[in-house]
């Protein structure tokens, strides 16, 4: 059984994916997850999506029965709700069978708060997560992310207002910097492009059939970390360490470093598989695509004009994300399929159209490195909040 710890890390995420690749189908999640690592909540969502593809996926609750407070607390959390949506069967702490439908009903109040309630009520530690559950019959797509009847992703302007509200809720009055709120506008462009990409490409499988259970979403986080502790927070991910080392040396920005985190996640076919399915019926999971071809396909998605649609004006979204992140001196992590990629922009830089090469997040190598399979895509962006700077 895969047992996720409260202090979930990206290193553990990779270990758990390896267990899934070996056929493990049982998953146990704690009622409270700290998920302090960068992009950890979104990575948990990807782990859950990958696990949920197993027809024997069984979820074990840390609750004696559905009527317990612990069961309600678990269901009323983004990780708990996503796990219940993906599970094929659910058992209690005692191993007794539990109704998945009844367990999900415990989350109704939480889902309503996620749609149009107070952000303070869905805040978890240092982040706010919104889930879009495409298979839900009611309240599937949050009005904070969708307009109209839930078929159109909100504009970047609307998302900028949402981000300002998130930043205000997440930051304390003592630590809030004016530059943080200034980041809402450029960050909204990143959020729009990334989430729009999930809406267009991540609701179906590699055959373009609608996914029976689909959870997509966004996490907005705020990090306030002592510079001396930054490097240790990177774990074994070498590209993270390189970025944090550069940030830690910038003592002129104060004892503590502040970051805005944006993560967008989905359980779709992944970037490379979306690229191939638009051109030729080659399945990565079936061994039809080499690792090098998968990496090349991901880079094609990131290039200016790269698109899986016939419209020549489309396909600039992921490229714009890299460009905006480079302009702000940020960091990008991309986990999709067999690839774990990252790019550090410790210094603000002019981004060129062909400059999309990334590094393996763990080894730092620019060559393709094989990792355990992960369904869907997680894109995590970190943007530094600088003192005295008008972003």
Q: Which sequence ranges carry the predicted segments?
A:
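Conserved short strand/loop->alpha-helix "switch" segment adjacent to the catalytic nucleotide/phosphoryl-transfer site
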Residues: 2, 33-39, 168-192
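N-terminal targeting/assembly segments of extracytoplasmic apparatus and virion spike/baseplate proteins
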Residues: 131-151
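Conserved ATP-binding N-box helix of the HATPase_c
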Residues: 179-256, 319-325
């Amino acid at each position: 059984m895969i047992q996720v710890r409260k202090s979930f890390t990206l290193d553990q995420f990779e270990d758990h994916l390896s267990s899934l690749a070996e056929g493990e189908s049982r998953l146990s999640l704690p009622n409270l997850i700290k998920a302090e690592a960068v992009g950890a909540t979104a990575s948990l969502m990807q782990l859950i999506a990958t696990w949920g593809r197993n027809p024997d996926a069984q979820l074990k609750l840390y609750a004696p029965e559905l009527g317990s407070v612990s069961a309600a607390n678990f269901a009323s959390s983004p990780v708990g709700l996503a796990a219940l949506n993906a599970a094929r069967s659910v058992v209690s702490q005692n191993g007794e069978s539990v109704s998945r439908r009844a367990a999900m009903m415990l989350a109704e109040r939480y889902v309503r708060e996620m749609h149009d309630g107070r952000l303070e009520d869905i805040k978890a530690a240092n982040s706010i997560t919104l889930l879009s559950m495409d298979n839900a019959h009611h309240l599937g797509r949050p009005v904070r992310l969708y307009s109209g009847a839930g078929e159109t992703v909100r504009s970047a302007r609307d998302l900028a207002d949402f981000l300002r509200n998130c930043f205000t809720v997440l930051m304390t009055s003592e630590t809030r910097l004016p530059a943080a709120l200034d980041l809402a506008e450029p960050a909204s462009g990143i959020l729009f492009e990334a989430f729009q990409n999930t809406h267009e490409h991540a609701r179906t499988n590699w055959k373009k059939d609608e996914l029976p259970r689909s959870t997509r979403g966004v996490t907005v986080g705020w990090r306030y970390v002592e510079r001396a502790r930054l490097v240790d927070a990177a774990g074994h991910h070498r590209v993270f360490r390189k970025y944090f080392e550069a940030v830690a040396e910038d003592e002129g920005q104060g004892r503590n470093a502040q970051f805005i985190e944006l993560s967008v996640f989905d359980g779709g076919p992944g970037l490379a598989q979306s690229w191939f399915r638009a051109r030729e019926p080659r399945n990565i999971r079936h061994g039809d695509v080499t690792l090098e071809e998968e990496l090349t396909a991901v880079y094609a998605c990131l290039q200016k004009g790269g698109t899986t649609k016939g419209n020549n004006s489309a396909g600039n979204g992921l490229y714009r994300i890299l460009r905006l992140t480079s302009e702000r001196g940020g960091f990008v992590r991309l986990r999709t399929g067999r690839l774990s990629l990252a790019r550090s922009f410790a210094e603000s830089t002019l981004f060129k159209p062909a400059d999309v090469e990334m590094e393996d997040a763990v080894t730092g190598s620019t060559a393709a490195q094989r990792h355990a399979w992960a369904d869907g895509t997680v894109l995590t962006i970190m943007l530094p909040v600088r003192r005295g700077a008008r972003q």
